Amino acid sequence: LFEVRLLLEGPMPRLPITALFEGVTDQAILSFMKVALKAHASLAHSGEVWYRGQANKDWNLLPGLFRSGKSASQEERAYREWTRRAELIEKPEENEWNHLFNMQHYGVPTRLLDWTESFAVAVGFSLVFSNFGETSVPRVFILDPCALNKRTTGRDRVFEIPEDKTISYRQTYLEGRGIMPTGPVAVRPSSYTLSNRRADNQAGVFTIHDNSGQPVDAQPKSIVTSFTIEKKQIPGARLFLKLSNVNAYTIYPDFGGLAGYIRAMLTNESK
């Protein structure tokens, strides 16, 4: 994304790539990129940058467990039931974190919030689930995970899970043993993505939240910021996705994603 600065700081070029979308002008894609770069500029930029696309600009950055009002006792029951029954479906999984990642992956409310290391994937999520701005105004959040962890744990790094033994999901968050970080913590499921194609394609990472239920967007704007994709920027954002080869199938590399990709292809051909 930052390579686009060179384009924005120089004279306005004529971009033949806009011919891929009828009616999309150079100004449309540059308008979208300028908004994104302006949001990036407000971060502390201590190292990595993560993204999250949401269909509705009014939604907070809360994980499913706190959006649904589930209690800690229900979380423990759900985890226990998952670990017991999951062994009947696949080979036994010994790692506590991989159980949690699988629960999140398949839609069980957890204290995890999904993020991605791919700007294009975040833009894709926000546009697709807002019907490209027709049902709501999409928003893309931008997070400095190292700055977040510095604030909530005192450690200026992302925790690589499960290799990093500093944090235990079961002991710290379920059983209440030890000291729970005050606020969300950025974690990377380093080995989990190797066995999960969807998580790998989405460049998936997470924040794990404490019992306060505080949303990530309550953090200072030097740690997390955002921008909305307004109606006038939608054409430029759609072209950006096309150039980035982001579609339903690249995000969801399974039969459901393939079906969504083909539906979109047929819809475009019928216009």
Predicted regions and their residues:
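Catalytic-core elements of nucleic-acid end-processing and repair enzymes
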Residues: 8-271
